[in-house]
């Protein structure tokens, strides 16, 4: 059969030309409830005046509680963001910003970033500006490190629950597998040696070469900091297995209550110091410092996700060199670097900002926890981040069976989204091992909007409790926990 030609003589086809496997891969994960909730919000966004019955976005970990402090600083110091004309003394000239700059980042900005990271980590670790590699946000930093540390079909181990975006960030373009390290609520979802080994064995049985462990500390979605002993256990695990550790610490400056953050950078530095004191090159484990890499960003602690500023930090010379080469695909604009170098170099402002931001986050966190408690909904005890880990496991008991299920969790999530009009992230999208947990973000909206959201949850719980009392009165004792919980919640509300 001859080739069919269009009228102009070109070969025709019944469909569009094929795209690459990366472009058409389902590994992006856009069909997950995490992204579906965002879509529902985009289609029906809440507005107090224009759309009061719309969806409230509680699935976005964005820090808006202190943006006014940065706005105030720039009003008082307009030169920080000003464009002057060359030679007029009115700030960096347009020419300075427009022409090619050092791909490794401006020296004054890397120096300011190093000092800022030291400050928010309590001065317990030092950062060499020459080892800072800039990227367009933490998403780019994590993907860049994945490209450097692993090959397609290799595996990274990630303790659960973890940030849903990691399935996209680490897998989609790299071809690397993500293997969950299953943690549970019995110990506050802390990582254990047994859980790490089980995940490693699972990956090996599937024919995957494990190349590293990635953790978030403070945790997204838990809003907690990792215990020192847990971090030491992870360091020992990666050393014994000759693999890497990536520690995503983008919420380091958002720790607002005890215990204080323990960064892996602090542990590596103290370990290296002890080794030097003993006259050794390292701490006895083969190159522990060489296998630990830190990711940071200004998106959360400064509330600047639109500026796209991320950092890869490593003591491994080969990793730093590779990251610099690859960072040409994910540069930070000169204007962004110059503006933020001015802001971060003002020590008095930075000190005031960090203290105020932590105080505001604690106040907002406590407000949410108290509001949920009044509605009869507990949360995991948190001390960091922009979210709470909400426990709705009791609402799943009796939903289609005696035990809570992930199917029941998704039905509850759908009700919260479609009926209550709240976009929260279900625990299953974070690969949580227990159904019934939800991540609820609280810093990306006004206090007034947050109170609307809490009132909606309270009304939903009222309705659920009233329905549950009648529904379960005739059931067996193993259902009584739900009945008693509902009765207690309902009677307590009436007494108020």
From Swiss-Prot:
This is 1-aminocyclopropane-1-carboxylate synthase 4. Its EC number is 4.4.1.14. Catalyzes the formation of 1-aminocyclopropane-1-carboxylate, a direct precursor of ethylene in higher plants. Pfam families: Aminotran_1_2. The modification N6-(pyridoxal phosphate)lysine is found at residue 300. Coiled coil: none annotated. One of its GO terms (biological process) is ethylene biosynthetic process. It comes from Oryza sativa subsp. japonica (Rice). Keywords: Ethylene biosynthesis, Lyase, Pyridoxal phosphate, S-adenosyl-L-methionine.
């Amino acid at each position: 059969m001859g080739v069919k030609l269009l009228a102009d003589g070109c070969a025709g086809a019944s469909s569009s030309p094929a795209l690459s496997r990366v472009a058409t891969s389902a590994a992006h994960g856009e069909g997950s409830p995490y992204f579906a909730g965002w879509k529902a919000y985009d289609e029906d966004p809440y507005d107090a005046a224009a759309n009061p019955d719309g969806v409230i976005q509680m699935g976005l970990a964005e820090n808006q509680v202190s943006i006014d402090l940065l706005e105030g600083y720039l009003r008082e110091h307009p030169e920080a963001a000003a464009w002057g004309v060359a030679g007029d003394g009115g700030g960096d000239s347009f020419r300075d910003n427009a022409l090619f700059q050092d791909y490794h980042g401006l020296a004054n900005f890397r120096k300011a970033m190093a000092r800022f990271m030291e400050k928010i980590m309590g001065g317990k670790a030092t950062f060499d500006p020459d080892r800072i590699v800039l990227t367009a946000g933490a998403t780019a930093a994590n993907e860049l490190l994945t490209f450097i540390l692993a090959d397609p079909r290799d595996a990274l181990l990630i303790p659960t629950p973890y940030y849903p975006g990691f399935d996209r960030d680490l897998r989609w373009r790299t071809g690397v597998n993500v293997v969950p390290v299953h943690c549970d609520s019995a110990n506050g979802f802390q990582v254990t040696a047994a859980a790490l080994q089980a995940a490693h064995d699972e990956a090996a049985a599937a024919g995957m070469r494990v190349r590293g462990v990635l953790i978030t500390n403070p945790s997204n979605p838990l809003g907690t900091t990792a215990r020192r002993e847990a971090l030491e256990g992870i360091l020992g695990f990666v050393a014994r297995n000759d693999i890497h550790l990536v520690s995503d610490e983008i919420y380091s400056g958002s720790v607002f209550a005890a215990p204080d953050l323990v960064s892996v950078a602090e542990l590596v530095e103290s370990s290296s110091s002890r080794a030097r004191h003993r006259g050794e090159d390292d701490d006895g484990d083969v190159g522990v410092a060489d296998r630990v890499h830190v990711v940071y960003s200004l998106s959360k602690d400064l509330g600047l996700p639109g500026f796209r500023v991320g950092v890869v930090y490593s003591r491994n010379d080969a990793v730093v060199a590779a990251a610099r080469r690859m960072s040409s695909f994910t540069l930070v604009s000169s204007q962004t670097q110059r503006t933020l170098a001015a802001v971060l170099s003002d020590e008095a402002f930075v000190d005031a900002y960090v203290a105020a931001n932590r105080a505001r986050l604690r106040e907002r966190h406590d407000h949410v926890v108290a509001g949920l408690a009044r509605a009869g909904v507990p949360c995991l005890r948190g001390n960091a981040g922009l979210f709470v880990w909400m426990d709705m496991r009791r609402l799943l008991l009796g939903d289609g069976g005696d035990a809570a299920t992930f199917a029941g969790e998704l039905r509850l999530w759908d009700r919260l989204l479609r009926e209550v009009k709240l976009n929260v992230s279900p625990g299953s999208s974070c690969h949580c091992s227990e159904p019934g947990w939800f991540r609820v973000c609280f810093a990306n909206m006004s206090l007034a909007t947050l109170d609307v959201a809490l009132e909606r949850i309270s009304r939903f719980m009222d309705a659920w409790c009233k329905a549950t009392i009648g529904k379960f009165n005739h059931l067996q004792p193993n259902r009584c926990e739900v009945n008693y919980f509902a009765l207690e919640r309902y009677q307590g509300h009436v007494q108020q």
